[in-house]
Amino acid sequence: MKSDLARSIVSRPPGVRDSVTVAVVNFHPVWGENNIRRIREFAESAAGSGADIIVFPEMALTGYDPDPAEAGEKRMQLRLAETVPGPSCEALKPVAAHYGAYIVFGLPERDGDRVYNSAAVICPEGRVLSYRKLHPFGRENTWCIRGETPLLVTTPWGPVGIGICYDSYQFPELVRYYAARGARLYINCTAQCANMQHGDGRTRFEHYYLTTLAGHVVANEIFVASSNLVGLDNTTRFPGASMILGPGVRRQAGLEDPYYRIYAGDIADCREEIIAATLDLSLAERTLYRDNPFTGVPDFRPELYARLYRELAAVQAGQ
């Protein structure tokens, strides 16, 4: 008999829609506190053009790059951190409600004396949710702490998973967890820098960014919507390249087809803009989580991986 988790992996709730229009924004933040008006304008434009889900980059609310001259509570990310819900979420709620859209944007989130690198999710019916980055990268650890909980957003298209930048590129466990729990769409809010005009900058960025996102599509048979910063943010240059990827064709006759397709966007898109595509989520078949017709059980083996990770955790703890 299948467990509740196994049933959730393979089942599809009744009434779930397949067709969804997703918009990702190449967004150039003004360093500091002047971005919410422009986020709202972009959200209204995308939603007015039919977008159901609108995605902004990591730290879109304030800008990403820290000022090395600032320390302690004077750091921009700490000074401008907001609660979720908070003022910026409230500013976007009318847009989400009017257009029936979901809006996702990155910000420094304050919860008491703690600050997180977060993605806020504004839902059309008024819910406001927060995903807190599980793996802060490098200098981010000087102003934020680790999140502890994945976020699956309940939508008319089934559960949608949220991740932020380093979570997506170096830790494939998060995307796999979401796909195993039924997500057919993964949202990546990112601030991935690169100097595309310098030496092998474009090649390195493409290998790290596009190759990794495409790998998630192939490995998990889900769609990925990635929104990146663009332009000069304080002293760091961001290349944009926001894009939407997904399975290219339906699997047929029991044959595997590890093909991916870029539905919208390009690695060379380096200007501020909205990039949108209408997706058929029925292509996200997530075959490895379903019963293999030759064995009667899924190829996906979480009980095995749990044992392996317990061994790794014990080693890391010095046991």
PLM region descriptions:
Residues 26-28, 57, 65, 132, ...:
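Residue-level recognition of beta-strand->loop/alpha-helix junctions
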Residues 2-10, 223, 229-319:
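C-terminal beta-strand edge segments of enzyme domains
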Residues 81-102, 169-273:
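CN hydrolase (nitrilase-like) catalytic-core segments centered on the catalytic cysteine
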Residues 36-127, 192-215, 219-222:
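Cys-nucleophile CN-hydrolase/nitrilase-fold catalytic domain and related Cys-dependent amidase chemistry
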Residues 21, 104, 118, 149, ...:
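Conserved beta-strand and immediately adjacent loop positions that scaffold enzyme active sites
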Residues 1-53, 187:
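N-terminal active-site segment of His-dependent metallophosphoesterases
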